[in-house]
């Protein structure tokens, strides 16, 4: 059975559908079954969207393994997100869209989001994605290199424990160069590792504690890696 992807598009996607079609057609060429939903009755309400994904998972002949939300949580082209209520912080996240069976927190599908505000942003995201997959940079073994960041100073030792577990999984899947950042100057170490090219990057901690900012993201330059 072919792998299946469900794209969730903003209800006002309009003439931008042609831009998204570039990505969807590429995925079909790769062998995926591709479906999309943009009905306002579904995509404008988080609960309705969750029910739609759950129904697809339970009843479709080829249910989605991957669900991609195309749009910001807020903005000109938006897909709503969820707000958790058990921490007291009302944290945002799309994970509930992936928990489709049972009363646990384990996902049944892979969930992701392509956030954009303008047509230009969307075109850039899709162009980079298609080029990355169709013409990967093979100049060095960067795709077997990983960086795991555990911000333990304030966030707690679980950040390191989580990354140590991830490191073991990566080693079992052939990763040869796994860097860990558990102390020191987090922004400079993260920027340095990202700029060298990584096949996998994970940050475990509370946002802002490490000192890594939007400006730091912009300063990373890893070319096609």
Which residue stretches match the model-derived regions?
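Cysteine-dependent hydrolase recognition
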Residues: 1-225
């Amino acid at each position: 059975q072919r792998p299946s992807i469900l794209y969730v598009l903003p209800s006002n996607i309009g003439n931008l559908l042609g831009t998204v079609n570039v990505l969807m057609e590429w995925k079909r060429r790769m062998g995926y079954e591709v479906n999309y939903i943009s009905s306002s009755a579904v995509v404008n309400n988080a609960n309705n969207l969750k029910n739609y994904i759950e129904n697809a998972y339970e009843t479709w002949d080829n249910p989605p393994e991957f669900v991609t939300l195309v749009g910001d949580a807020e903005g000109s082209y938006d897909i709503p997100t969820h707000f958790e209520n058990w921490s007291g912080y009302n944290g945002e996240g799309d994970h509930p869209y992936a928990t489709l069976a049972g009363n646990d927190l384990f996902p049944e599908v892979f969930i992701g989001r392509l956030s954009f505000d303008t047509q230009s942003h969307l075109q850039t995201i899709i162009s980079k994605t298609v080029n990355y997959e169709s013409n990967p940079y093979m100049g060095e073994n960067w795709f077997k290199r990983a960086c795991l960041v555990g911000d333990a100073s304030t966030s707690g030792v679980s950040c390191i424990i989580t990354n140590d577990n991830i490191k073991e999984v990566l080693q079992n899947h052939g990763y040869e160069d796994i860097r860990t950042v558990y102390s020191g100057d987090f922004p400079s170490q993260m920027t340095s590792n990202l700029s060298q090219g990584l096949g996998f990057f994970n940050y475990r901690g509370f946002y802002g504690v490490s000192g890594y900012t939007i400006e730091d993201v912009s300063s990373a330059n890893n070319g096609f890696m």
